[in-house]
Amino acid sequence: MEYIQDQNQKISIKRIGEDPVLDVHQKEGVYWLSFPQLDARQEFLHGFSTRLGGVSKEHLYSMNLSFSRGDSEENVRENFRRMGEAIGFDPEKMVFSHQTHTTNIRKVTREDCGKGFSRERDYQDIDGLITNEPGVVLTTFYADCVPIFLVDPVKKAIGLSHSGWRGTVGKISQETIHCMQESYGSRPEDLLAAVGPSICQDCYEVSKDVIDRFKDGFARKYWPELFYEKPNGKYQLN
C-alpha cells in the first residue's frame, strides 16, 4: 500500500502486480496520477486527479471536481483551474461526458470545448469521448468505476471511456475502439490502452444478478479471473 497526503488527509493507493503502472505527481500541492507509458508519448497529455490540492471544504475536501455535490461553483472552477495548471491543460478546452452507464460514444471537436464546464451540453447519455483535434481535453468522472484511456499515436487520436460494470458487460472499450476506427481510421494493433484507478476486487461486493450478466457476456474460461462466490451468497467482482 502506498500513501499520499497533505496536512489534513491521507489517501491510500493499492497497486496490483509488481511493476508500478501509475506514477504519482505533485505540483504546488496538487496531486495527480499518470501512466508512464503514455507520458512517453509527449504529444499526448493525460492525468487522473486525486482528492488533494483543491479549495473545497468538509466532506468534499479538497479537490472536488463535481458541480452536482453541493459545492460552490467558485470552488469547483478554482479546483479545475489548479488541476489544469498542474497537469498543463486549459479548463475551457474541456469537454465533459454525461455518464449514465451506457456504451454510447461521442466524437468531439473544438466546437464542443467548454461543454459541461462553462456552457451547457447539447447531448446526454454519453460515457465515452473520442477526438483527433489538438487541444481538446476529454473529461470523464469516476468513483468506483474504471477509466479506459486509448491513444492512437499513428492517427493522433484519443479516446476516454467510463466503464462501470454495465459498461464492462456491454464492452464499452470495444465500442470506443470501433468508433475510433470508423472516425479516424485507427487500427486496434496501433492503439495504446491503459486501465485507470478503480475499485479493487477485495472491496467490490456484488449480487448474483450482476454476476449473471457477466456470465452472459464473457466466456466461462474468464470467470475465475472475474469473480468468486462468498459464503453469504454474494460475489467479489474483479
Which ranges hold each PLM region?
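Active-site microenvironment for binding and transforming phosphate-containing groups
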Residues: 1-238
